[in-house]
């Protein structure tokens, strides 16, 4: 993927993530007199919202990092081995910072 296309896709992703994060950070559920079941449901919803916010924030960080790589000329190169990241991977995940092999190694270590 060329740098211009990558930048456009990444900037679009960043704008969408910023919108999503804004929605997820919206007003907390107002505390009212509720049944125990309703209160439990609110906690579950809050936990789910927090999990989605955590994922969106991490993805936003990856997109910002990818934009920095576009700026410094290293976009499309694996941050671990410096080999090219396959175009198919970048098409699917423009924010990808590692080739498939290095990403697999990283995930196995977790």
Give the ranges of each region predicted by the language model.
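Short, cysteine/histidine-rich loop/knuckle motifs that typically chelate Zn2+
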Residues: 80-81, 101
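Cysteine-rich micro-motifs
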Residues: 95-104
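Cys/His-enriched microdomains
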Residues: 76-79, 97
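Conserved RNAP core-binding helix
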Residues: 72-76, 83
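Interaction interfaces in information-processing and related assembly proteins
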Residues: 1-72, 92, 109-110
């Amino acid at each position: 993927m060329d740098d211009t296309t990558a930048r456009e896709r990444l900037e679009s992703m960043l704008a969408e993530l910023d919108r999503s994060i804004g929605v997820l950070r919206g007003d907390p559920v107002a505390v009212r007199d509720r049944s125990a079941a309703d209160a439990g449901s609110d906690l579950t919803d809050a936990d789910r919202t927090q999990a989605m916010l955590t994922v969106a924030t991490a993805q936003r960080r990856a997109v910002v990092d990818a934009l920095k790589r576009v700026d410094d000329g290293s976009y499309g190169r694996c941050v671990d081995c410096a080999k090219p990241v396959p175009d198919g991977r970048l098409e699917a995940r423009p924010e990808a910072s590692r080739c498939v092999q290095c990403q697999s190694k990283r995930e196995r270590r977790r």
